[in-house]
């Protein structure tokens, strides 16, 4: 994403890891239940992977979204970048990135989806309306505004 410390895309292979590291990636979030990632290459290039196995065409759990958001923050706050992927980089991974934008930039789900779609037009439509995204947004608001009650 232009201007952001996050890269969103499809599953990487061992041959992709040197390039990811060269552009500042220090962490990878792998949303694929069906793919463990190029673990040896990550170790060789000192890239930390967070594996949040999620079945294709289903949204990640709220717990996994929070784990992903915290992982991104950890790497970004240390000066790194994070590559977030699922198989195609359109659904599972885009959901985590959308929630990080809500968390870090204070966007609404609709604003985050519009921002993401502008930079990656082929993400799945309707991510902002996913129940888990709405729940994440409500919990974000409740943390930052004591008059809001999470439902």
For the regions a language model picked out, list residue spans one by one:
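A phosphate-binding catalytic loop at a beta-strand-loop-alpha-helix junction
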Residues: 76-98
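Cysteine-based protein phosphatase catalytic domain of the PTP/DSP
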Residues: 2-82, 102-144
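Intrinsically disordered, low-complexity regulatory segments
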Residues: 145-151
């Amino acid at each position: 994403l232009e201007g952001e410390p996050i890269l969103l895309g499809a599953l990487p292979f061992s041959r992709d890891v040197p390039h990811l590291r060269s552009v500042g990636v220090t962490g990878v979030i792998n949303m694929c239940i069906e793919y463990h990632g190029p673990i040896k290459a990550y170790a060789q290039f000192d890239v930390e992977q967070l594996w949040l196995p999620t079945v294709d065409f289903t949204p990640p759990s709220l717990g996994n979204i929070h784990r992903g958001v915290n992982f991104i923050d950890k790497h970004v706050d240390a000066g790194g970048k994070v590559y977030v992927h699922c198989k195609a980089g359109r659904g599972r991974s885009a959901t985590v990135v959308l929630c990080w934008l809500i968390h870090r930039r204070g966007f609404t789900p609709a604003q985050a989806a519009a921002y993401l779609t502008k930079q990656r037009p082929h993400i799945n439509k309707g991510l902002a309306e996913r129940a888990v995204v709405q729940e994440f947004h409500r919990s974000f608001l409740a943390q930052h505004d004591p008059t809001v009650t999470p439902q």
